[in-house]
Amino acid sequence: MLAKRIIPCLDVRDGQVVKGVQFRHHEIIGDIVPLARRYADEGADELVFYDITASADGRVVDKSWVARVAAAIDIPFCVAGGIRSVKEAGLLLSYGADKISINSPALAEPTLITRLADRFGVQCVVVGIDTWHDAASDSDRVYQFTGDEARTRATAWQTADWVQEVQRRGAGEIVLNMMNQDGVRSGYDLRQLEQIRAVCRVPLIASGGAGAPEHFLAAFSQADVDGALAASVFHKQIIQIGELKRYLALNGVEIRLC
């Protein structure tokens, strides 16, 4: 059995790490490289960096900090933000990223997923999916351009359908960003995770809602996700990664201890 992964998420805007609530009202957390180094030292299994306004601004993630992160840490990391071509992805990988993640660009041009997988291998290609549960219609809908409140909009895709589509096109991993839960620390959306797990054949990463060690345990034990991503609880040191991993191991989760 593969070990489950604990993955701090660093949202980047204007060269700094920020964090919002439900993808809005972002506050500055700190500088990129010191935070990355801290999480690596604390025992994170990998890191994810989202340049949250790159897609909405029509640009690609800033490569200068990617190289600095690669020089500072010795754990895998994934980079996302406005990657629209094989060439742009290749440059980020050449600067030291281990994986690249696409979200809004995949919605705009789904064939990009296949081209990236064919060029770099599925193990390098992550698709991020921003999903919002609409209580009125009791449906889960994919959103795009979520890094910019003014430009965020719903797509025509139901979440489960898009999950199956990106797998068919070559996604090697899926990060499910549950927008309703983002930053509120009330727990991952287990209902949605379980539904997506049933149709997801590739590694599935839960994102949005972690507020206590029990929330990570529930995602692993009930929804059988492969990794759990979180931001504010790590940024604000509400949860220590080493302590979290020991708690999970004591509760039967296969995890790499620090």
Swiss-Prot record:
EC number: 4.3.2.10
Keywords linked to the UniProt accession: Amino-acid biosynthesis, Cytoplasm, Histidine biosynthesis, Lyase
Enzyme class: lyase
Major subcellular site: cytoplasm
GO cellular component: cytoplasm
Listed CDD domains: HisF (cd04731)
Pathway: Amino-acid biosynthesis; L-histidine biosynthesis; L-histidine from 5-phospho-alpha-D-ribose 1-diphosphate: step 5/9
A single MF term (Gene Ontology): lyase activity
GO aspect biological process, one term: L-histidine biosynthetic process
Protein's cellular compartments: Cytoplasm
Pfam families: His_biosynth (PF00977)
Assigned protein family: Belongs to the HisA/HisF family.
Self-association and partners: Heterodimer of HisH and HisF.
HAMAP family, A to Z: HisF
Role, per record: IGPS catalyzes the conversion of PRFAR and glutamine to IGP, AICAR and glutamate. The HisF subunit catalyzes the cyclization activity that produces IGP and AICAR from PRFAR using the ammonia provided by the HisH subunit.
Name the UniProt record assigns to this protein: Imidazole glycerol phosphate synthase subunit HisF
Encoding gene (name): hisF
